[in-house]
Structures are given as structure tokens and as C-alpha cells.
Amino acid sequence: MRQPTPLPRELRLLDTPYLHLLDRVTIDPVFVMGLHRSGTTVLSLCMLATACFNTTTMYNMLYRRCLLHLHLHPQEGAARRKELADYFESRNLVTRTYDGIGVGPDAPEEYGEALGNKGRQPLLNARNLPGFMELARKIQYVDGQERLLLLKNPWNARHFLYLAEAFPTARFVFIHRSPLEIIDSQIRMFASLLQERNEYELLLVDWYGELFEQPWKVKLGQWIYGENSPYLYWKIVRHVTRTCEYMRVHRQALGARAMDITYQDLCAQPLETMRRVTTFLDLQPAREPDYAQFIAPRTRPLLPHVARNRTKIERATARYVEEFGLSSRKP
């Protein structure tokens, strides 16, 4: 089965006649903030289970240019949704493969892939903010303005001050995890994306599909970004340590607009931790979900080069670990 596309190129302006419907649509965003592999997806799934939020999904990300049209023409919208579901089934796509998180047309997806940064880090900025605001309003119009809009893009973890300025009413839920575990998990994740073609990522990332059309580039990428690559290791360590320090230094600038939880607490005490989150957001879910169903922490040895450099990593992130009350991983 062919890969589904949002719409033929010449039809991507189908929403234009309906944009006036967004004039009075407001958004009240809640940003989940944290590094990749810090637990942002698990936290988002727990929050979405309360039925108090809308969010970006695979469906509304792929069809973002015609979302209003498909909503106002339900038969066509249902056909597009079925096309996407059939694609998942034909590829036997049940999870994202690298972390076991389930996928499907209505599964939550990070908004970063809608920002059009063409291979660069998908950061929300002044250039792409208007287009993103339009997408956010479309989602609220289609899915219901009585819910808050939950947004997640770990690439923005080192740029949340801009988000706070761009969205003056936004609130932030930070999730923190041991930097050592984050680094180890990120290396495994990014290396796996080049080890074999990931059909799920093909739907979202144009350059990823183009890369696998050129086998020599794949081989080169596997060498540079392999699980045992010193380059990938140092690149990730640099990114993680810088982001941890940014969060440590600037988190308090958000004041009462933000709260913090740890991945360790979410795994050990999911109900109590999520009650803190819903209380902070002034939410009263009609029922309390079984949050534990989304949590499946894995224990595995650190990669050899991460283990060898453990002391250096812990020294570089010690103030962050202390600031947010994180526990050190046992050797």
C-alpha cells in the first residue's frame, strides 16, 4: 500500500475558505516540558487519559492543511482516516518500535514535525509561530474548545522562555529524569532510526524517507550515528547537559505558571503524581484513569561508553539533579 499523503499538492489550500471560523477560537495551552526520553510521552498519555485535553495527533498533523475541510466534509474525513489506518495495518505498525508506545491515526504526536524546519531541530520560533497558531486553533475548533490544548515537543526544552512569551496564558508541566538514563536512552533511540527503516517516521519526516533512498548515505549515517559512535555520544551528552543547565537556571522564571514532577515519582506513584498535575491545572476529571497502564519502566545495563563516562556525566549535571530532587542510578 502506498504511503498516505495529506492531499495532492494542488488541493492543499482547501481550508482557505473556512479560516474565518477560527477568528474567535482561543487556545489555552499546556506544555509538557522535558528532554527526549525523560518521560514526556508517558506523562502526556496519562494527561490525555483524563479526557480534559486535545492534542496534536498523527491524523491532524498529516492533514493539517485541510483539517477544517475534512471536519466539515465528514465522509471525506472518514476516508482519509481509514486510509491512514489501512497504512498502519498494511505495515503491521503497532508501536513506534524503539520504545513500545502505541501508534495509530489518533495517537498523540509531537507538534515539532509540523514546524517545517527541514532537517534542523524543529523549534517553535517567530518564523513558524503564525502557522503553528493556525494549526492549534484548527485543532481546538475541530475537537472542542472546552478542553485545554496539550502540546509536547522535547526539542523546545531549551527554549521554553520563548514559549512563555509567545503564549502568555500557557502553563508548563516539567518532567525530570536522571541525565545518565536520558543520555543512554537517547543514544539507543537515535541509533535505532538508522539501523533499519522506521515506517512510522517515514510518515512524518520527509528527509528520513529521502535518506533511505540512498543506501550509501544510510551506511555513512550508521557509521557516524551508530550506538557505539563517539560522535553520537558526545553530541547527545552536549545537548543533554546544556538543556539540563538551561532548565536549572531558567525554570524559576516561570513562577506559578509551571510545576515539576520526576519520572521516578510518576513510575512509583502514578496516581498521587497525576493528582498533583490535575490540581495544578485546576482540573477535575470525571473519572480517574488507571495511569499505571501507561507505565512500563525498563531496567537495562548502561551502554559501555556511557558507563565508562558515568562520573563525568554526573559531575556535569550534579546541580540539575540536586535542584529537582533526582535519584542517582545504582551502578
Description of each model-found segment:
Residues 33-34, 152:
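The Walker A (P-loop) glycine that initiates the GxxxxGKT/S ATP-binding motif of P-loop NTPases
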Residues 54-56, 170-178, 195, 285-286:
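Short hydrophobic/aromatic-enriched beta-strand-loop microsegments
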Residues 152-154, 163-188, 277:
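Conserved phosphate-donor/acceptor-positioning beta-strand/loop module used by diverse small-molecule
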Residues 41-54:
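A conserved segment at the C-terminal end of the G1
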Residues 1-24, 30, 187, 191-331:
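PAPS-dependent sulfotransferases, especially Golgi type II membrane carbohydrate sulfotransferases
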Residues 37-38:
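ATP-binding Walker
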Residues 59-150, 211-212, 221:
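PAPS-dependent sulfation machinery
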Residues 148-152, 260-262:
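Short catalytic-loop micro-motif centered on adjacent basic/acidic residues
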